[in-house]
Amino acid sequence: MSENEIKWHTLEKHQTKDIHDGHVNGSLIPVWRNWDKTISVKPEMVYVTSINPGERKGPHLHIIRHSYYVCIKGKVVFIIKEKSGKYLEIESSEENPVLVEI
């Protein structure tokens, strides 16, 4: 992937069900499976960050890094400045999970 390339992958979301009565008890979102070939650079670190309701984080700047992001609860809008100077907005949420690769 070139330095200027930004990718995003729409992720699958599956309901999970209780084993006793079958009611929906949550969801499952496969972020990475080795046969999908969505992750092009082997991760060296994985972490989870959270934010309280009504709060905002950012801006946050990384100059040299290959990163993957996905929102697992709520909604996040990633605002990414491309090498051309153009800004790109990518939304990821618990309803519509998107894996962003920068």
Where are these regions (language model features)?
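Non-catalytic, conserved peripheral segments adjacent to functional cores
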Residues: 1-98
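Short, intrinsically disordered, charge-balanced linker/junction segments flanking boundaries
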Residues: 100-102
